[in-house]
Amino acid sequence: MSGDSIHRRRMALHCPITSLILLLIAMSAHGYNIDLPSYVRFRQSSNSMFGFSIAMHKGRSGFYGNQNNVSLIVGAPKFDTSRYQQGVTEAGGVFKCSLNDDDCKLVPFDSKGNNRNVDKEVVDRKSYQWLGATVATGRDSDLVVACAPRYVFHTMTPSRAFRIDPVGTCFTSHNFEEFYEVSPCRTNNWGYHRQGSCQAGFSAAINGNGSRLFIGAPGSWYWQGQTYSIPPDAKFPFKPPLYQPFGTGGMASSHDVTRPENQVFSTSESASVNDDSYLGYSMVTGDFDGDRSEDVAIGMPRGGNLVGRIVVNRWNMANIFNITGRQIGEYFGYSLATSDVDGDGLDDLLIGAPMYTDPDNVEGKYDVGRVYILLQGGPTEEKRWTTEHIRDGYHSKGRFGLALTTLGDVNGDGYGDFAVGAPYDGPEGRGVVYIFHGSPMGPLAKPSQIIKSEQLVEGAPYPRTFGFALSGGLDMDGNTYPDLAVGAYSSDQVFIFKSRPVAAVNAETSFASNSKLISLDDRSCQLVRDHKKVPCMLLTTCWSYTGRYLPEQLDFDVSWLLDAKKLLNPRMFFLRDEGKNIRNQTIRLNYGQKYCLNETVYLLDKVQDKLTPLEVEARYNLRSSRPLDPMVRHRRSILEPVIDQNREIVLRDAINIQKNCGPDNICEPDLKLKVSTVDKYLFGSPEPLVIEVFISNTNEDAFEAAFYMVTPPDLQFRKLQQLGEKKDTPITCSPPTPENNHTLKCDIGNPLESGKIAHFKISLVPEEKYGSSSSYDFYWEANSTNLEKPGSEYDNKIRQSVGIWVDTDLDIKGTSLPDYQLYKADDYKELENATKEDDIGPQVVHIYEIRNNRPSIIEEAEVFIHLPYETIVGDPLMYLLNQPETGGKIQCDDVAFNEYNLLLDEKLVKKSYLQAQGAIWNSAQVSGQSSSSSSSGGASVHIEKARGEGFVRGVLVSNSTDAGDKLSPKQVEQRRQEDTLEALGDASFVHRDRASQAVQEPQVNQTSFTTYSTSSSSSGSGAPSAQLRGHSTQGHIQMAGPVQHTSSSSSSNYRSWPAQQQQQHQQLLLAGSGGSGLGSPVTFNDKSQFGGRNNNFHTGTLDLGTLNRGNVDNELYRSQGQYQNPSQSLGQSQGQFQANANQGHYQGQNQAQFQARNPGFQGQTSYQGQTQYSGQPGGYQTHHVTYSSGSKPYYGRENEDFYDEDNLQQATPGHWSSSSSSSSSSGTRRLRRSNDKDGATEKPLQIDLNSPCQSARCKSIRCVVTNLGTEDGDAAFVAIRARMVAKTMEKLASNVPLNVSTLAVANVTLLPFIGAPKDAIVKTHEIFYKAEPEPLQVPDVVPLWVVVLAACAGALIFLLLVWLLYKCGFFNRNRPTDHSQERQPLRNGYHGDEHL
C-alpha cells in the first residue's frame, strides 16, 4: 500500500474520532436532567435576605396536571415592612412566587403593628423579628407556616419594668386565605432559665396531611431546647393566663379538645448536663417506625457531649429512638430531610453535619461537611436503622450538608433522589448544589450532577451563598418530574431549576455469530473497489425507549467504532464504506418500539494479529437542537428529553479469528494440565504461595485456549511469570475479582498450536482478612472454545488443597510505675473522707504489653486483668481512677472507676503513660482516657431505642438518654430559688452554679431494683421469679414504662445486674491463703445501681505477695453452727476453723476476723460481715482444669499460670450451682465469647469466671486484642492507673513492706483460618508493686537534769532583766504638759472625719 493511501486512511480515521469526541462533549455539557439554561430567577430588594428559607407549596389544586396553584414560598427575614406595619422596621416578609406570572407577591402573614395591653402599653417588639427565617408547607395539604424566631415579648415586672424575651412566634394559613398566630413560648415563664429565650420557630415542619404542626424552640431552659406538637386548626389566646403552659386557658377549636389529636404536646426540661444542646434546631417529618403514622425527627446539633444528636419522636412527643453523631463540633443534625433512597417504600433519613472535618487530612482542610444517609429497613425491628451511607464534602470551608432536600424520583427510575447544598463551596466559594440519585443499594457513590453558582448567568456577578436553602419534590412546570429550588440569600435571589424528561433506552449490539469466531477462509463478500473476496460478518444494533412525558418519536445520533482495541491499525471495516471503521448516523425511534440496523463488516485480506479480539463499540445519544454552550440562558425553551445516563450508553461486542483446522474446519485439541505447588503454606510468611503450571497441546490447534484458576477469596494475585527458554506462546491474564467469582483467567494462545506449551508460575499472597477454612482450596482448568476429543478431558481439571500452617507465640509482659515506693499513712485520709485523688494514697500504674513472636497473626485474644480493689473483708485497697488506657489493636470493656467521685488530677488524667514509656508514638493511638467519674463516651453514630435488649451490629440500643431525665424535687426547688434571684436582679452565682453543673457528670442517673421470691431446699435449688422495675422519664428523649423481667435459676440466690453494664456473676470465694486451699463458691444477693458508686464486681482472693506469705499468719472464721476439720486447727475455740484447711463442711451465719502479727507491733484488727452460705467441697485443680463431683474448690500453686473453664452447672444434690437461665441479657451468667457455632456441646475454655485471687477481692477487666501481628507496631498495650489506699495498707502492714500485685491472663480465642484453637493457649504475667511505710523518726532523749537546769537559768535571767528596766524608770508614766495635740481633729484629709 502506498504512503498516500496510508495517510488518507489515517486522516479518515482522525476526523471521525474528532466528531466522536465532540459528540461526547455534547452529551455531558448539560449534566443530567436538572436543566440549567431554563432556570427561573426571582429577586427582591438588596439586604432583605430574600431566599434565606424556601418551600415548595402545592396548594389546594396543585396536583399533577393542574399547576395553577403550585408556588414557591420564600422567606426574606430582613425585608423592610415599615410601609405595611406602623412603628415596625425590618420585620421580615414572606413571598409567594409563581412560574406562571414570573413574579413574587408579599403574603400578609403579619400586617399589624406592635401589640398593646389594656393600658395601651407595648407588650412586644416586631421590628427585626425575622419573619420568614423559617417557612414550611404540607406535602399533601394547603397548610403553610412562616415563623419569626427573633420576635420579642415584654413581660411586666412588679415595678412595671419591661423584660425583653425573644420568645419567637409563627403564623399559619390554609392556602393564604386566613392567618393565625401561634406563639408557644409567649407565657409567664420569662427568662432564659425558662422559656424567655426559646426562639420558637427556629425550625418548623408540617406532616403530610397537614394535621400536625411541629415547632422547634432551641432556646428554652438554658438553651436545652424544646419542641411543640400543635393542632394547626386550633385557636389560642394571646397569652395563657398566669403560669399555665401554652395550649391551656381558653383554647378554641372546632374539634373535641379532650381528644389527644386536638391537644398540644411538648418536650420538657432536662438535666443541666443538657444545657446548650439546641433541641429543635431542625426537624423533618416521616414514618420512621413503620406504623404508617408520621413521626418527627428533631435536630440537636450540640447534644450528646457536642457530637450532635437526632431525637425521633412520635406526633405526641413520645420518644422512639435517638441517633448520635461521631465527631465533636460537626453539628450533626444541622439539617434534616427524608427520601426513599432505596425504593423500598420506607422513609430514609438524611442528616447534615456541615462542620465535619476529616481528622486524617494533611492539607489543613476544615468544615468540609458530611451527610449521613440512614436507610430504614431490615428483617427485624433491631435492624431497621442499621444500614448507613456517608457522603463527604469535597472542599475546605464548603460546609457540604448545610442544606438538604428530597427531590422525589427526579429521573424516573423508581428510587428517591436528593440534593445537598454547600453554600461556600466552588472555585470562588459562592456555592454548589450536588444531586445524588438513589439505587437499590442506596445512594450512588458519586453525585449525578453538580450545579455551581458560576454556571447560572452570562457573566459576573455570580450569586453568593448559592445552596443555603433548598426545596424540591414537587412538579412546578407540569411535566410530571419534580423540580428543584435553590436560595442564595446573600444575593437576594432564588432559582427554580426544571427537570427534563428522561428516556430509558434499551440498546444492544452484537455480531451474528454464536461461536463469536470469524474464519479467514470464509470469503463470502466482495469489495466494490478491487473486487476482492474478503471474510465478512453481519453486525446488528437495536434500540428502544420508554419513560414518562416523552414524545411519540425521538431522534438519536448513533455511531459505531470497529476494532476499537486497535485504532492505529484497524483490521475490520464497513462494507458500504470501504476502508472506514467509523460510522455516524441519525435514526428516528417510535415510543416503545424496537428498531434494529444491520451492517455488514469485513476483514482485511491479510491479518497479522490473529490473537486480539475484534471489538465493536456502538454509542448513542439524543439529538438536540439546543446550543452546546450551557452559560446561555434559554428561559422559555422547551425542555427536551435526556437519556438515562445511569444506564450503559456504550455498547460492545467482540469476535475472534479462527484458523483453518482441516477439511471439516473443526479442530479437536488435546490439552494436558500439570500443576505443582507446596502441600502446606505458613501463614504470615514473607514468601508468596507459588503455583507452577505446565500446559501442552498434543493435537490440533486450540482456539482461545485459556487457563482458569478459582482462587480462595483470602488470596490476592500478585504476578505471573513465564518459564522456559522459548516463550513463543504469549500469555495474558485477567486478575480474580468478586465479580468473576475470584477466577484468574489466562489466555495462553489463540490458537495454542499443536505441539506448543504454556509454562508459567503464579504468585499469590494472603490478604489482611482471614477466612474460616483451614486450607486453601484450588480448582485449575485448561480449555478452549473448540471441544476436545471425547474422553480426553480428564487431564484438563485438577483440584487440590494446600494446608495452612499457623505459627503463633503469645507473649505478655508488664511493668509497674513505680515498682517500689515509700509512703506515710498519716499524710492520707480514709477513702470515705477523701475529696481528691491524692488524698487516698500513692499512685501506681501497671502497664501490660501483649506481643506475638511468631509469623502468623493472632486474630483474637482475650486478656483478663485482675486487680485487688479491696481486701477480703471489704476494705478498699487499690482504687481505680480511669478506664484502662490502651494502645494498638486492643479494646477493653467498660469498668466502673472513681466510684467515690473523687476530684481527679487533670494532668494525670490527660497524661499518656503508654506514650511516656515509649509503647506508642502518637497520642492519637491512645484510647480509654476519660475524666468522668462513672461513665465513658464515644463519637460514633449510634441509635438508642426506647426499649432495647442489647446490642445490634454495633448500634447501641438503650432505654434511656441523658437528654430526657426528669427533674427531681430538689432540682425543682433549685429552679424556684433561681427564679426568685432572677426577679431580684441578683443571679450571678446562679449562672456560675449552672455552668459548673453543666460540666459535671451526675453520680446516679438510674437505678434498678430486683426483687426475688424464692423457694429453696437444702440443696440450693429453687425457682426464683423477678420483676425488674424500669424507671420512666418525662421529656423529649424517652417516655418508657415499667419493664417486666422474669428469669429462672438453678441457684436459690443470685445477683441481677444493670442492663447496660457487662453481665458478670459475683461470687464470694472462701479460699486458702497458703500454697493450697479449699473453698466452695457461694453467691449472694444485692441491689444494683447504675452510675456513681458501685461495688458490683467479681470478687475472690488474690495473692498479695509478702502480705500473703510473710506478714499475715491466719484468717479466722467464726461460725454459728458446726465445723468438722480433720486437719490441724487453730486453738481450742469452738466454731473456729483455719482458712487453709484441706477439706471441711461449714454452714450457718459467719463473722470474719482478720488477725495480723508483725515484729514490733501488738494489736488486732477485726472486720465483720455477714454472709449466708452452705456447701460441701469437692475437687478442682487449676492448672489441669479437672473437676470432681460437687461445687468447685480451688487448689493453688505458687507462680503457676491460672486459667479456668466456664461456670458450668453441676447439679449434684446437696451442692451449689451458679449457672442460670434468663429470658433477657440481664442475668447472673457472665458474658463470654461463644465459639460453638455448629452447636457442639464442648464448652470453650473460660479464664475469667473464677478470678485467681487468694487474699483480696479482685476486679476483673476484660480486653480483646485483634489482629496481633509480629511487627513492632502490632503490639498491644494496656495501662491501668490506680491509687493505693494508704489507710488500708497501714492496717495490713503498719511497719513492714507490703507486696501487691495485679495479674494478667491472656487466652488465644481465634486464629486465622482455624478459628478457636483446640488446645488452650494461655499466658499469664504478674506485676508486683512494693509499698513500704516510712520509718518512724525517734527523737534524741535529753536528760532531765539538763532541762531543769536550763529552766532555772532562764528564770534568773528574766528576773534580772525586769529589775534593770524598773531601775531605769521604764514602768513610770509621765503625761505631757501641752494638751494642744489632743484637741486636734482626726481629719485624714476628708471632710466629715471630725465625728469619728
From Swiss-Prot:
Residues 963-979 have a biased composition (Basic and acidic residues). One of its GO terms (cellular component) is apical plasma membrane. The keyword DNA repair does not apply. Pfam families: FG-GAP (PF01839), Integrin_A_Ig_1 (PF08441), Integrin_A_Ig_2 (PF20805), Integrin_A_Ig_3 (PF20806), Integrin_alpha (PF00357). Residues 960-1107, 1159-1246, 1377-1396 are annotated as: Disordered. The chain crosses the membrane at residues 1342-1366. It is a single-pass type I membrane protein. One of its GO terms (biological process) is axon guidance. Residues 32-1341 are extracellular. It is found in: Apical cell membrane; Lateral cell membrane; Basal cell membrane. Residues 1007-1021, 1060-1071, 1162-1182, 1217-1226 have a biased composition (Low complexity). Residues 1-31 form the signal peptide. Residues 997-1006, 1082-1099 have a biased composition (Polar residues). Keywords: Cell adhesion, Cell membrane, Disulfide bond, Glycoprotein, Integrin, Membrane, Olfaction, Receptor, Repeat, Sensory transduction, Signal, Transmembrane, Transmembrane helix. The heavy-light chain cleavage site is either in 1230-1231, or 1233-1234, or 1243-1244. In ovaries, highly expressed in follicle cells. At syncytial blastoderm stage, expressed in the embryonic mesodermal precursors but not in the ectoderm. At embryonic stages 7 and 10, expression is restricted to the mesoderm. At stage 12, expressed in the gonadal sheath and the interstitial cells of the gonad. In stage 16 embryos, expressed in the somatic and visceral muscles where localizes to sites of attachment between adjacent muscles. In third larval instar wing imaginal disk, expressed in the ventral compartment and in a subset of adepithelial and peripodial cells (at protein level). Residues 1367-1396 are cytoplasmic. GO terms for molecular function: extracellular matrix binding; integrin binding; protein heterodimerization activity. FG-GAP repeats lie at residues 36-106, 117-174, 186-239, 266-317, 318-383, 386-445, 452-514. Glycans are attached at N69, N209, N322, N584, N598, N741, N783, N833, N959, N1005, N1299, N1307. Heterodimer of an alpha and a beta subunit. The alpha subunit is composed of a heavy and a light chain linked by a disulfide bond. Alpha-PS2 associates with beta-PS. Belongs to the integrin alpha chain family. Alpha-PS2/beta-PS is a receptor for Tig, wb and Ten-m. Involved in the function and/or development of the olfactory system. This is Integrin alpha-PS2. It comes from Drosophila melanogaster (Fruit fly).
